[in-house]
């Protein structure tokens, strides 16, 4: 029999039923090959596992199986070299690969689709692809966490004004502040691992929606492809996109954490704060103002966060009105998912490098901490330790701060008699509690900002991250 590609002749795999060809406009509107071709490796891996199982079950002959393996190797070589011709008429990655395989090996290529539908095929492809991307993102998250820890360690003693409501609140270690983001990104990594468990289920064998009459060994295919198990309901297997939504939700939250870090980097770099500087390679200038150094990378990351969150909303909206089982709507899951992966990976990769290029300005940080009466809580705690109820101590200190503001002084600059006027329990040991360093060192509670605690957490993170 001729090896001419029957799919090419018919234009589509279902054309025998139809009396007129699909219009060119509809072809362009419905084709997905321009973007789903990135699934080619997963598609071929899934097909090879399916073919191996068909042969083991006696559904494919050994000769046909060998031909498929040989032909797929040629397809892989062509795709990797750029010689493979992706055809719009063949609509998607699946039919393009099947068509080329059939050109190469003849009828054996036509038998590959036995017991399979594109519905369970694409669900398998996306899960395989996404599983690999989750693993890659996990590695990037680890690299970003290590970069933050590397900057936190030499800055454990550096005093930064801690803020609530963007008002100076209490002094904190700059290293401690950076470790807060390590905690966020660690949770992101945990969430992605949890999502991966639900991604790692095999839909193949569900066929179009009802399963198949062929004696397929789905567990064998799952083992071959490294899946933890198989999807247990054929209708759900082909129509489920929860895993894509879950992943995009986890990615959105990760980008939100990047955006929060970006916002702080932007503020800290501004002249109003002047706490840090970013390396020139992450900034741009102005076409009109020669003095400008703009933090474009964190600004753009802040903007891209909205894009990823938008993809999450798109996927949720895509699924909300679909009846079981597969619908063409689901073709619209790929571009948001693909772009989410690309955006997140690029962002994490660049931020690991950006964080390592931060120049810290400790003097500016300490000056800012001194301006905001950051040790007021320490004075209240001092009075509590002298026997006052906290609410009474709070009121006493509020009066002291009001006086200090009127005199243009920090609390630590008020003389002892002035402080004793607010409460007689205040003695000459009070000034040790009112220094920024004293405030920092006092917070020895587990998870606190005392440098010793910061170093303890750094050691914990290094052990966890293997660095």
From Swiss-Prot:
GO terms for molecular function: argininosuccinate lyase activity. The gene is argH. One of its GO terms (biological process) is L-arginine biosynthetic process. This is Argininosuccinate lyase. It is an enzyme of class 4 (lyase). Keywords: Amino-acid biosynthesis, Arginine biosynthesis, Cytoplasm, Lyase. The lineage of its organism: Bacteria, Pseudomonadati, Pseudomonadota, Betaproteobacteria, Burkholderiales. It catalyses: 2-(N(omega)-L-arginino)succinate = fumarate + L-arginine. One of its GO terms (cellular component) is cytosol. Belongs to the lyase 1 family. Argininosuccinate lyase subfamily. It is found in: Cytoplasm. SUPFAM superfamilies: L-aspartase-like. Its EC number is 4.3.2.1. It holds the Pfam family ASL_C2. Gene3D superfamilies: Fumarase/aspartase (C-terminal domain) (1.10.40.30), Fumarase/aspartase (Central domain) (1.20.200.10), Fumarase/aspartase (N-terminal domain) (1.10.275.10). It comes from Methylibium petroleiphilum (strain ATCC BAA-1232 / LMG 22953 / PM1).
